[in-house]
Amino acid sequence: MVSRVWRPFLFGFFAQGHGEIGVPPYETAVISGIGCSSRLPYYMNTYAMQTIHGRAAAIATGFKVANPDITVWQISGDGDGLAIGGNHFIHALRRNVDLNMILLNNRIYGLTKGQYSPTSERGLVTKSSPYGTVEDPFHPAELAFWRPADVFFARCIAVDGAASVEVLKAAANHKGASVVEVLQNCVIFNDGTHASVATKEGRAKNAIYLEHGKPMLFG
C-alpha cells in the first residue's frame, strides 16, 4: 500500500517519467531533505538518501561531483528548498552542476502543521501568521532565471500527469542544472492554493503550455 502522505506527483508521475527516461536504477540517485516531499527516496529502487533539513541541494551537488556518471534527482518542498535551504538552492544554480532539482510548491509548511513558507501568498492566514502574512512570496522561476541560458526551468501542476512526465524527461535531458517547480496542493493546511489551474477547465483558461521551438498559444 502506498502511504497517503504521498501526493499524486510522487507515487505516479515521477516513477513513470523516470521509467521513460531509461536510466537504470543503479545509475540513478534520489536525494531529499525534510518534509512531505522528502519521503520519495524510500520508495525508489535507486541509490537514495534522505538528508538533513535544507541541505539536499548541497549534498546532491557533492554526490554528482563525486559520481559524474550517476543521474541525480534532488527533491524538496518550498520550505525545505527556499527557506533554510535557499542559500544552497541559489549556489546549486550558480555552480550549474548537472543535477535535476524538483521543488514541490504547496505554499505552506505541511509536515510541521501549517506555518507560512517563503512562497505563501501575502495575507495568507496560518498558524504562524494569524493576521495574515506581511511578506511578498519568492517566485522560484525568478530565482532560476537570474542565470540566463544555462539553467533549465519548467513548471507543472501535479494533477496534470502527461505534462509532468514530459517536463521531467526534458529536465533529465538538459546538461546542467535543471529546476522543475511542481504546483502541489496541501489538502490539510492550504487547500485550493493552486485552484486556478487545478482542473482541466481552469488550465484551459489560465495556463499556457510552452514547448521549445513552438509558438505560444493562448486560450
Q: What is each residue range found by the language model?
A:
Residues 84-98, 104, 108-219:
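Glycine-rich ThDP/TPP pyrophosphate-binding loop and its adjacent helix/strand module
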Residues 1-52:
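Active-site diphosphate/adenylate-binding microenvironment
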Residues 3-11, 52, 56, 133, ...:
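Generic structural signal for well-ordered, non-membrane alpha-helical segments
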Residues 16-18, 59-60, 86-87, 165-166:
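A generic local structural motif
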Residues 31-110:
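Thiamine diphosphate
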Residues 14, 62, 141-144:
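Structural element of the ATP-grasp superfamily
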Residues 5, 76, 158:
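Conserved residues at beta->alpha junctions
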Residues 3, 21-25, 51, 64-68, ...:
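Solvent-exposed alpha-helices and their adjacent loops that cap or buttress functional pockets
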